[in-house]
Structure formats: structure tokens, C-alpha cells
Design a protein with these regions (language model features):
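Cytosolic-side transmembrane-helix boundaries in multi-pass membrane proteins
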Residues: 41, 72, 76, 133-140, ...
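Single transmembrane alpha-helix segments in multi-pass membrane proteins
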Residues: 1-11, 37-53, 129, 186-198, ...
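Transmembrane helix-bundle core of multi-pass membrane transporters
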Residues: 46, 54-121, 148, 173, ...
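Alpha-helical transmembrane segments within multi-pass membrane transporters and channels
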Residues: 15-61, 68, 202-207, 234-238, ...
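Helix-loop-helix "hairpin" substructures at the membrane interface of multi-pass membrane proteins
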Residues: 96-173, 197-202, 261-262, 412-489, ...
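Residue-level recognition of pore/gate-forming positions within transmembrane alpha-helices
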Residues: 2-6, 28-31, 60-63, 108, ...
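Membrane-interfacial amphipathic/re-entrant helices at transmembrane-helix boundaries
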Residues: 14-23, 49-54, 85, 91-102, ...
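Transmembrane alpha-helical segments in multi-pass inner-membrane proteins
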Residues: 13-29, 150-236, 321, 346-347, ...
Length: 573
């Protein structure tokens, strides 16, 4: 919206009212049409897949749009034109306020009022609210659901484009706008309450005021102030400020699964061949292949730790990097500050991360659905801010350097075998836990918490322990990662790292136990191969979209279906 507005206002005549405001509205309309096109071509095809797949597909769209914007407008920030007739300032209570700021202040309640009227006083709005509550019933009444949801997506995209376009006199346009606003938009919606437009407006006012005055009152907390507010709100009011308790109910992170069963014989043979190939890799491949293999193995363990709570537990975490980075920092600080060897420092990684997950999980498991996911994100951002600002311990943005394995394990081949052994052990332990009574109880709580509790299962406690074990597993991956890279930085606890794990799980398949390994391999190899090309974001985004559309059950889920089908005798039902 911002980029299009800069170009269209220039085209229409930036110095005239018609040129400026016409360019802003035209940019918003173009963005709305592009959003509707994305819904028709991409999202409509995966509505029956797990809901998080839609999030993954939109992430791919973001990568595509980033590279297209880079090609079209270049890497430099664009300065937007000033609004004609609004270049002065107004004095209010002795303070000078830009006139255009008053326009922005007035625009928000006007949009709020328009949306309220649209959703509460029109037939279309009633149908949208009805379809949100029960889509199948609305379809049974003869309403064209596809057209209805395309219109909703157009409206949302139009408003997003309008927001980007209307702010160009103040902020211009740059390539980092998308990721910079996504987290804030999520926070506002969750604090306000899912399904509450008024709640989102109220939350945006609160966050805006805190961001403005927080610099003066709590300068150390400016990095995570909105996440602190979100954490406090969700702990005391899990459905948001103006949301309803029924909106906090989970909508599911996975489709209905068949009962767990041992892997088919063909799959076990394929797994044995893969393990044999991994054991022979140092003798057959060069140093670069070993470095890449170590990264794939470490990220597979990281993704498996997230899958353990997402698949069997039904808990989608948006902040799992807190435990990956926490384990990495624990091992690095034990090595550099305490002088411990890898034999003592590496076990501290899962221990520290497990304790951190135990503390955060106590609050998180009381929530469900997107509220659970956003609270995990809030805690992860708090941990990330500590890593950035506690420079005396963590080194801040400079990180902790010089964390290398000792001579006896320093050879790359030897370290590869250590990583392979620990990752294989972690994956095997995770699989056995899922097939244990603990794992079945966890699945029971995911599928029906009320029934599980009626059977005497303490669902919250099972989920809490699973969350802690998952954090410990992620911490082990972080410890192995820091010794493979020789350093750790706050980026390992950031939002992009958490979303890397989420993408790997979804690409591999939430419903397949082998999904994290397949997803980690696919994502890492794709990123490594495409990052050497000029348009790597575009190609990676298209690859992610293609994989999501081709394998809505995930790569491993698709492979398991094929192997299971081929293993059936001819004529079997």
C-alpha cells in the first residue's frame, strides 16, 4: 500500500488534493484486489488443511512481495509526499501538533464506525458473522461461501493497504514495513479480543500511548512493552479486553488424525537406508555438505521439539525460539564465563531451557488456540529483550563468541557424529514418549479436554510437562547449534527463528511423526540453494506456496500415505 501510494500520488499529481487522495485510495483498492486474488488462487485451495497452513502460505506471499517490491522500487527507502493543504501545525494546549496527525487521529474512529455499521447493520455483515460461527450451516442455507470470504479478504487487504498508504507523509515506504507491522497487528487483535473490532481499536490506543510514553517512563522496556502488556492481559483475561470466552476456544491446529500406529515396513526400510546414508556421509561428502548436514540435524531436533506439543498436544507455539536460544546461551555462557568444557556445558543447555519452559509454560497452558500461541510469543520477546539489553552477561548485539568444541571433538566429522547421535537419540525418545501412556494422555487432552478430565487425566499438568520437555529438547538443539557455529546472538531467540521452526513443522506435516525431519531438510536445503540467487526470497516464497498447495498434509504425511497405500495388498479396501 505504501509503495503503491508513493508511485500513484506521483502519477496523479502529488500537489493536488485529487492527486494525493486519489492515489491513496487507488493504492488501497489495488492492494484489496491483490489480496482477493491471493485468496482465490492460494488460500481457497487449502481451507481444508490445518489452519496454520494458511499462515505459512501467507508467509510465502510476503517473501514474494518483498522481492517484487525490491525489483520495482529498489532497496532505498522512499519518502512520501506531504498531503496538500495539511503541511502546517496546530497549537493544542501549548503543544504544536502537525495538521496531518489530526487527520490520522480522525481516520481511525471513522473506519471503526464504518466497520461496525457494515458488520451489524447490513445483510452482508450478518452473513459474515454467521459464516464465522458456522460456515457449513451458512453454506447449507444457499449462501456462496467462497464469494463471501473473498469479499472479506478484499476488505481486510483494502484496509491494510489504506493504512500503509495513508501514513506515507510520515513514514514513507521501506522493504521492512511488512515484518515490522505483523507482530504489532497480532498483538492488537489478541489484546482486544478475537472477533471484537472495538477491542482491537481500544488495544491499538493503549499500545500507541504506551509506546509514546514508555520511552520516557521505562526506556529499558521499549523493545517489548506491547508484549508485556499482552502477557499481563492474557494472564488475567485470557480472551482479551472485549473478547468473549467462547472466542478463546481452540479452532484446531491439525485435521482429525487416525490412531497412532507403528510405521509401515516400507517406511522403516526407507528410514534405515537414510540412517545408513547419514553414517556414511563424512566418507562421501566434503566439508560444506557436513556443515549443511549438521545444520539440518540440529534444526530437525528443534522442529521436533515444537512438533511434540503441536501435533500430539495441539498447542501451537509462536515463541519456541526462546528455548532454542536459551539453550544456546546457557551452553555458551557456561563455556566462556565459567570455563566449562563441552561435557559439562552442553548438558546445561536442555536443563536451562527446560526450566525456562517450565516457568513460562505454567502460564501458557491455561490458554487455548491463538491466545496460547501469542502468550508464548510474548514470553519469547521478553527473553529476547533480555538477551539484547543485558550486555554485561549476554554481550547484547555482539553476542557470545569463541564457543568451539574441544580438540578431541573439534574435527568436523567427529562433531557431526556427536550431533547425529544426540539428535537421533532425541528423536527416538520423543517418538517413544508419544507412544507411551503420557503421549496418549496428551492426545486425549488435545482431542477432548472435557472427556479426558472426566477419565481422571489432569490435562493442564500433562500439557505443562510436555511443554517443559519440549523446551528442553529445543535447548539441546540450541546447545548443539552454538558449538557448530562458534557463537550465539540474540537473533536465535527472535520471532523469525520461531517462525522458522513453525514452517519446518508445517512443511513436514503436523500429523506425521517424521514431519519435523522432512520439513527441516526441505526448508534448510531450499534456503541454502536459493539464497545464492538474486531473487531468493521470491523463489523461496513460491516454493513454500507450492509445497503447501501440493502437500496440504505435509511432505512426510504425503510420503507416509503413499507408502501405506503401496504396502496394501491388491484389492484391499
Amino acid at each position: 500500500g505504501a509503495y503503491l501510494a508513493v508511485s500513484l500520488t506521483e502519477l496523479f499529481g502529488r500537489t493536488t488534493h485529487l492527486g494525493f487522495w486519489g492515489g491513496v485510495l487507488a493504492a488501497a483498492l489495488v492492494v484489496g484486489l491483490l489480496g482477493a486474488l491471493v485468496e482465490i488462487l492460494v488460500l481457497r485451495r487449502i481451507y481444508k488443511a490445518p489452519e496454520l497452513f494458511q499462515l505459512l502460505a501467507t508467509f510465502g506471499v510476503i517473501l514474494v512481495v518483498q522481492d517484487l517490491a525490491l525489483w520495482t522500487w529498489g532497496a532505498e527507502d522512499l519518502q512520501g509526499p506531504r498531503a496538500p493543504g495539511l503541511r502546517g501545525a496546530v497549537t493544542i494546549m501549548g503543544a504544536r501538533l502537525p495538521a496531518y496527525d489530526l487527520v490520522l487521529i480522525a481516520a481511525s474512529p471513522l473506519v471503526l464506525g464504518g466497520l461496525w455499521l457494515l458488520f451489524n447493520r447490513t445483510r452482508w455483515g450478518v452473513l459474515v458473522r454467521a459464516a464465522t460461527a458456522d460456515r457449513e450451516m451458512v453454506g447449507a442455507l444457499g449462501v456462496d461461501q467462497a464469494r463471501l470470504f473473498t469479499a472479506v479478504f478484499f476488505l481486510g487487504s483494502f484496509l491494510a493497504g489504506l493504512a500503509g498508504a495513508i501514513q506515507i507523509p510520515k513514514g514513507g515506504a521501506n522493504l521492512l514495513m511488512d515484518f515490522g507491522i505483523i507482530a504489532a497487528a497480532f498483538v492488537v487483535v489478541v489484546i482486544g479480543g478475537m472477533g471484537s473490532i472495538g477491542g482491537a481499536f481500544l488495544a491499538s490506543l493503549i499500545i500507541g500511548q504506551l509506546q509514546a510514553f514508555g520511552v520516557l517512563l521505562l526506556p529499558q522496556a521499549t523493545l517489548v512493552l506491547m508484549f508485556l502488556v499482552m502477557a499481563v492481559v492474557l494472564v488475567f483475561r485470557p480472551w482479551g479486553l472485549l473478547g468473549r470466552p467462547d472466542e478463546a476456544a481452540p479452532r484446531g491446529t491439525a485435521t482429525a488424525e487416525a490412531p497412532l500406529a507403528p510405521a509401515p515396513r516400507a517406511f522403516r526400510v526407507a528410514l534405515a537406508l537414510l540412517l545408513a546414508a547419514l553414517l556414511l556421509l563424512p566418507a562421501l561428502a566434503g566439508d560444506f555438505a557436513l556443515v549443511l548436514a549438521i545444520e539440518v540435524l540440529v534444526l530437525a531436533l528443534f522442529a521436533a521439539s515444537l512438533h511434540a506439543i503441536m501435533g500430539p498436544g495441539g498447542m501451537a507455539s509462536f515463541g519456541h525460539a526462546a528455548y532454542f536460544g536459551g539453550g544456546a546461551y546457557a551452553a555458551a555462557l557456561a563455556s566462556q564465563r565459567l570455563g566449562l568444557g563441552i561435557e559439562a556445558a552442553l548438558p546445561l543447555a536442555p536443563l536451562a531451557a527446560g526450566l525456562l519452559a517450565l516457568a513460562f509454560g505454567w502460564f501458557c497452558v491455561r490458554l487455548r488456540g491463538v491466545y496460547f500461541a501469542m502468550l508464548t510469543l510474548a514470553f519469547a520477546q521478553i527473553a529476547w529483550s533480555l538477551a539484547v539489553q543485558w550486555t554485561e552477561v549476554t554481550g547484547g548485539d555482539d553476542g557470545v563468541l569463541g564457543v568451539w568444541p574441544p580438540a578431541w571433538i573439534g574435527d568436523r566429522s567427529r562433531y557431526y557424529y556427536l550431533v547425529l547421535a544426540l539428535v537421533a537419540g532425541g528423536l527416538l525418545a520423543s517418538r517413544r514418549a508419544i507412544f507411551s501412556p503420557f503421549g496418549y494422555a496428551l492426545r486425549a487432552g488435545r482431542d477432548s479436554a472435557l472427556r479426558a478430565e472426566a477419565l481422571g487425566i489432569d490435562v493442564a499438568r500433562q500439557q505443562w510437562f510436555a511443554f517443559a520437555l519440549s523446551g528442553a529438547c529445543a535447548g539441546l538443539a540450541g546447545g548443539l547449534y552454538v558449538y557448530s557455529k562458534g557463537s550465539v546472538f540474540p537473533d536465535e531467540m527472535s520471532i523469525p527463528r520461531s517462525f522458522d521452526a513453525l514452517m519446518m513443522v508445517l512443511l513436514g506435516g503436523v500429523g506425521a511423526l517424521e514431519g519435523p525431519v522432512a520439513g527441516a531438510a526441505a526448508f534448510t536445503l531450499l534456503e541454502s540453494a536459493l539464497s545464492r540467487l538474486g531473487a531468493w526470497r521470491l523463489l523461496l516464497g513460491l516454493s513454500i506456496i507450492g509445497l503447501v498447495m501440493a502437500f496440504p498434509q505435509g511432505i512426510a504425511g504425503f510420503a507416509r500415505e503413499r507408502l501405506t497405500r503401496s504396502a496394501k495388498p491388491a484389492g484391499a479396501a
